Amino acid sequence: SLNTDLRKVLFGKMTVSDISGEMSVAGGVLSLDRLGLGVFGGKATASGSYSTAADPAKPALKLNADIAGASFQKTFEELEMVQKLVPIFAKTGGDYSLALDMRTSLDSQMSPDLQTLTATGEIRSANIRVQNIEAFDALAKALNNDDLRKIEAKDVTIRFAIRDGRITTQPFDLKLGSVGINLSG
């Protein structure tokens, strides 16, 4: 068992700061218990495990995390999995909070194997801004309504699941200019 207090850790492009909590190692399993950390411009708590017990070539990761005040853009810049699964984060402004329960195998680069990734969660944001999306720009031009070029949403909650490398969401509401829309899928 190890009580952790680390100021800054670099993991690929991701910077993790102010790590504190308890870690233990036994039988090829690193367990994390209520680890606190700074990530993506916000604060997080995480519990879970990293295991090489079953297959050292494909470590298993189990993670339960709660993140508050994180930046959409910082998350996109720092996390390759988000670049692959949620490319719209590159064009999204604002901060979010996230509750996540995730299971996956890791590849040789310590990245999640998207074919083994399963997760459920909920992302919440008080203010989301999405712009420079080609489809919405074309719609705005066709309808001669520049308000349609950007999506803005307040107090959004999106429940989602990830299976077989695909994200699905339960229905949620956004505004496209002054037009309300309901999305899911």
Q: What kind of feature is each model-predicted range?
A:
Residues 1-15, 20-185:
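Small-residue helix/turn framework positions
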